[in-house]
C-alpha cells in the first residue's frame, strides 16, 4: 500500500492545473495529508471567468448530448463504469491520502461509484412510457433533461457523491459541472478525468475552488437549470436562496443527527456491532452516522458496558495501515471543532465513558487525529446531543417508554436516518411510522443500499438519490395531448358561438 501511495504522490505535479483553473497565483490552495499534516500538492483554483467558460462549454455539449437515445446513454454509462473499475485501486489510495479514511473504506467508496454508474446505465433504457387514454384526447408524458446542471460536493465521500449525482444526471440527458470539496478535491478531479475519456467532450466537467466564490457563481449562472448539493445545512440553505432568484430547482442532501433507538428486547450482539459501525465508520464524518444512541433503561447498563469495551479497542492511525479502524479527520480546523465538542460535552455533565488512543509519535504526530469517543448519561438538551459533530463522537442516553423515544428522536432539527432495534416487529414498524426522518433502518444499519431512495426531511434537506426515482428528479415533465378521433373534443361555448359563419 505504501508503494502505491508513493507512486501516486510522485506522479502529482507541484501545482495541479486543470482545464478550468485560472492563472491567478493567489487562487491556489494546498491539499494536505491529514494523517501527517504534510502537504500533498497545490491546486490552482478557478475563478469567475473559468466558471463562465465551463458552463458555456457544458451548454454547447448539452445541445447534442440531450438527443442521444436512452440506449446510447446507457452504453456510455456502462462503459464509464468499466473504465472507473480499471482505476479503482488508484482512486482508493488517492482518496485515503487526501481524506484520511482507511484505504479499505476508500475502496468501498470507489466500488459504490462503479456500481451506481452500472445501476443507472442498466435501467435508463428500460423505463416504461406513460400514455393516458382520456376519451377524446390521448396524452403522453415525455421526460426531458433540464440542461446544464451543477453538483456541489463535500470532502467526506467524493466517489459516492460524484456517482450519486453524475450517473442519473447524465443518464437523463443533462450535462454537469462539478465543484469538489476543497479539503479533498484530487479524487474527484481524477474521476472527472477518467469520465472525460469516455463521454463526449464537455459533458462532464469540474471547477476546483476555495470558499463560496465558485459554488455561488455556478448556482447563480442563468444557463444552469438544476443544482444538487451535498453539504452542511448552512451551505444548503445558502445554495437554495441563490437558486431561488432564478427559480432553479435544487436537490439538497444535508446534515444529520441520526438516532439509533434500542428497545429492551433487541438482539444485543447485533446492536453492539451496528452501533459501533454506525457511529465510527468513515471516522464519523458522515451525515448518516448513528451519532445519537437511545437505549431503553432496562438494557442501558449492559449496552453501555459493551460499547465502552468496544470503543477502547478501536485502532486510530494512518489510513494506509490496513489494521486502522479510524483515520484522521480531514483538516486541522475539523479536528479542533470536534475536540471542542468533546470539551463541551464534559462541561455539560455528560460522562466520558471511553476514548481511544490516537497516535502521538513519529510521522503521525502532526496528523489531525481525534480519539473515538463515547459519552454516556447524555440528555436531549445537551449540545452534543443536538449538533452534528461530524467526527468520531457518539452519545448514549436512555428512555423509559416508546412515546418518549419517538419524541426524543423527532425533537431534532434534522431528519435523515434513524435505526430501530427490537425483536417485536409490530412495535418496530409502529415506531418507524412515527419517526420524522427520510430513512428508517430496522434491525440493521446498512446505509449504502443502491436502488433505494436516499434523502431526508427538515434540516436534512429534500430530494432523493440512488434509486429509479432519481432519474425523474433529473428530468422535467412535458405533457403532449392529441386528438384520439373517437369523440369530439370539448370546446368553450363562447368560442363556438362567435366563430360560426
UniProtKB/Swiss-Prot annotation:
Where, by residue number, does NAD(+) bind? 231-236
Pathway given for this chain reads: Mycotoxin biosynthesis
What UniProt keywords are attached to this protein's entry? NAD, Oxidoreductase
List, from the UniProt record, the residues annotated as the active site of this protein: 253, 287
According to its UniProt record, this protein's enzyme class is oxidoreductase
Q: Which SUPFAM superfamilies match?
A: ALDH-like
Catalysed reaction, written as an equation: an aldehyde + NAD(+) + H2O = a carboxylate + NADH + 2 H(+)
A single GO molecular-function term is: aldehyde dehydrogenase (NAD+) activity
EC number(s) per entry: 1.2.1.3
> Carries keyword Nucleotide-binding?
no
Entry annotated with the keyword Oxidoreductase:
yes
| CDD domains noted in UniProt | ALDH
Give the disruption phenotype, in one or two sentences.
Answer: Leads to complete absence of citrinin production.
Described function: Non-reducing polyketide synthase; part of the gene cluster that mediates the biosynthesis of the mycotoxin citrinin, a hepato-nephrotoxic compound to humans due to inhibition of respiration complex III. The pathway begins with the synthesis of a keto-aldehyde intermediate by the citrinin PKS (pksCT also named citS) from successive condensations of 4 malonyl-CoA units, presumably with a simple acetyl-CoA starter unit. Release of the keto-aldehyde intermediate is consistent with the presence of the C-terminal reductive release domain.
Q: Which family does it belong to?
A: Belongs to the aldehyde dehydrogenase family.
Q: Cite the PANTHER family for this sequence.
A: ALDEHYDE DEHYDROGENASE-RELATED
Q: What is this protein called?
A: Aldehyde dehydrogenase citD
Annotated organism of origin:
Monascus ruber (Mold)
Amino acid at each position: 500500500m505504501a508503494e502505491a501511495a508513493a507512486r501516486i504522490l510522485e506522479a502529482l505535479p507541484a501545482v495541479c492545473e486543470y482545464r478550468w483553473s485560472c492563472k491567478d497565483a493567489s487562487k491556489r490552495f494546498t491539499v494536505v495529508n491529514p494523517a501527517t499534516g504534510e502537504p500533498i500538492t497545490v491546486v490552482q483554483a478557478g475563478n469567475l471567468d473559468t466558471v463562465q467558460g465551463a458552463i458555456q462549454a457544458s451548454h454547447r455539449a448539452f445541445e447534442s448530448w440531450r438527443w442521444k437515445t436512452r440506449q446510447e446513454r446507457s452504453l456510455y454509462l456502462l462503459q464509464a463504469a468499466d473504465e472507473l473499475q480499471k482505476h479503482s485501486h488508484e482512486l482508493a489510495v488517492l482518496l485515503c491520502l487526501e481524506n484520511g479514511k482507511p484505504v479499505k473504506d476508500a475502496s468501498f467508496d470507489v466500488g459504490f461509484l462503479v456500481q451506481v454508474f452500472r445501476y443507472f446505465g442498466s435501467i435508463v433504457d428500460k423505463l416504461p412510457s406513460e400514455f393516458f387514454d382520456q376519451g377524446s384526447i390521448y396524452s403522453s408524458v415525455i421526460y426531458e433533461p433540464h440542461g446544464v446542471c451543477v453538483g456541489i460536493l463535500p470532502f467526506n465521500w467524493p466517489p459516492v457523491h460524484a456517482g450519486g449525482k453524475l450517473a442519473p444526471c447524465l443518464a437523463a440527458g443533462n450535462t454537469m459541472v462539478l465543484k469538489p470539496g476543497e479539503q479533498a478535491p484530487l479524487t474527484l478531479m481524477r474521476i472527472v478525468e477518467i469520465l472525460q475519456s469516455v463521454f463526449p467532450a464537455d459533458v462532464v466537467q469540474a471547477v476546483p475552488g476555495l470558499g463560496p466564490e465558485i459554488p455561488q457563481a455556478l448556482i447563480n449562472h442563468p444557463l444552469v437549470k438544476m443544482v444538487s448539493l451535498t453539504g452542511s445545512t448552512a451551505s444548503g440553505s445558502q445554495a437554495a436562496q441563490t437558486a431561488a432568484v432564478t427559480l432553479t430547482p435544487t436537490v439538497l442532501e444535508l446534515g444529520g443527527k441520526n438516532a439509533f433507538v434500542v428497545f429492551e428486547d433487541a438482539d444485543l450482539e447485533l446492536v453492539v456491532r451496528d452501533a459501533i459501525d454506525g457511529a465510527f465508520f468513515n471516522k464519523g464524518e458522515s451525515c448518516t452516522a448513528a451519532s445519537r444512541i437511545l437505549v431503553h433503561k432496562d438494557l442501558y447498563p449492559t449496552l453501555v458496558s459493551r460499547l465502552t469495551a468496544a470503543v477502547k479497542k478501536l485502532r486510530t492511525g494512518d489510513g494506509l495501515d490496513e489494521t486502522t479502524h479510524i483515520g484522521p479527520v480531514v483538516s486541522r480546523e475539523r479536528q479542533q471543532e470536534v475536540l471542542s465538542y468533546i470539551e463541551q460535552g464534559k462541561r455539560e455533565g455528560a460522562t466520558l465513558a471511553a476514548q481511544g488512543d490516537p497516535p502521538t509519535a513519529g510521522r503521525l504526530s502532526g496528523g489531525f487525529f481525534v480519539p473515538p469517543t463515547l459519552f454516556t448519561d447524555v440528555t436531549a438538551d445537551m449540545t452534543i446531543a443536538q449538533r452534528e459533530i461530524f467526527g468520531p463522537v457518539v452519545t448514549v442516553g436512555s428512555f423509559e417508554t416508546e412515546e418518549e423515544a419517538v419524541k426524543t428522536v423527532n425533537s431534532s432539527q434534522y431528519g435523515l436516518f434513524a435505526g430501530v432495534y427490537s425483536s417485536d416487529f409490530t412495535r418496530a414498524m409502529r415506531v418507524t411510522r412515527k419517526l420524522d426522518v427520510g430513512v428508517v433502518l430496522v434491525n440493521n444499519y446498512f446505509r449504502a443500499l443502491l436502488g433505494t431512495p436516499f434523502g431526508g426531511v427538515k434540516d436534512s434537506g429534500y430530494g432523493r438519490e440512488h434509486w429509479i426515482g432519481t432519474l425523474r428528479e433529473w428530468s422535467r415533465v412535458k405533457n403532449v395531448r392529441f386528438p384520439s378521433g373517437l369523440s369530439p373534443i370539448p370546446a368553450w361555448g363562447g368560442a363556438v358561438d362567435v366563430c360560426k359563419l
